[in-house]
From Swiss-Prot:
One CC-aspect GO term: cytoplasm
Keyword hit for Secreted: no
Role this protein plays: Cell division protein that is part of the divisome complex and is recruited early to the Z-ring. Probably stimulates Z-ring formation, perhaps through the cross-linking of FtsZ protofilaments. Its function overlaps with FtsA.
Compositional bias (Basic and acidic residues): 39-50, 183-203
GO biological process: division septum assembly; FtsZ-dependent cytokinesis
Keyword Heme: no
Top-level taxon of the source organism: Bacteria
Keywords per UniProt: Cell cycle, Cell division, Cytoplasm, Septation
Name of the protein this chain belongs to: Cell division protein SepF
Region Disordered: start-end pairs: 26-51, 167-203
Gene3D superfamilies linked to this entry: SepF-like protein (3.30.110.150)
Location(s) in or outside the cell: Cytoplasm
PANTHER family: CELL DIVISION PROTEIN SEPF
Length: 203
């Protein structure tokens, strides 16, 4: 005759203090592996830096640096000027003969372009500006600096411009350039013909 559980045992079981029985037998438990997989180490994206071009790419075989001189007549010519900047050619921009609105529009565009190229701009005189590509220091080039027009041909550079850029302008050369600009301004004031021209003295 099977032994009946005693009153005490039944009370303990009723209250939940009895011996716990495993619901699973040995061997029924499965080892659960984590579902994730290790990812291969990622390489950080290379840092984008401005393009650095050595200065040795500019001098020609004769040891001179070709400076492109431009006197634009329309805004459509700015693309050609920017192409010269992108090719790392120094540019002298002459805006003396343009009206105020067109000159300012061209100047703003080219200033933005040379900034994007990490170059520098320098005002030479009233209406004349110099754009240097990155890595080009005109003051260290010596006198081996010549002017050339887009498409070739002779260039009539304003007196003293290149010398002033190199820091070697004499008083007479620079004075001639400034005097010529002053004469043009005075003639425009007298005749009223050039009142629409840009006031470069405020730039």
């Amino acid at each position: 005759m099977p032994n009946k559980p005693g009153l005490w045992s039944r009370l303990v079981d009723y209250l939940g203090f009895g011996p716990e029985e495993d619901e699973f037998e040995d061997g029924e438990l499965e080892q659960v592996q984590p579902a994730y997989q290790e990812e291969p180490p990622r390489r950080s994206a290379p840092e984008r830096r401005g393009q650095v071009v050595p200065i040795s790419a500019v001098p020609s075989k004769q040891g001179t640096v070709k400076v492109v001189v431009v006197e634009p007549r329309s805004f459509e010519e700015v693309q050609t000027i920017v192409d010269q900047m992108k090719a790392r050619r120094p540019v002298i921009l002459n805006l003396e003969s343009l009206d105020k609105d067109l000159a300012q529009k061209i100047l703003n565009f080219l200033n933005g372009a040379i900034y994007a190229l990490n170059g520098e701009t320098q005002r030479v005189s009233a209406g004349i500006f110099f754009y240097a590509p990155p890595g080009i220091d005109v003051s260290t080039m010596g006198r081996g600096l010549t002017g050339t027009a887009i498409g070739g041909g002779a260039v009539d550079l304003p007196p003293g411009v290149l010398e002033k850029l190199m820091g070697t302008a004499s008083g007479s050369q620079e004075g001639d350039l400034l005097a010529r600009t002053a004469r043009r301004s005075e003639e425009g004031d007298r005749t009223g013909a050039d009142r629409s021209k840009f006031d470069w003295r405020n730039q």
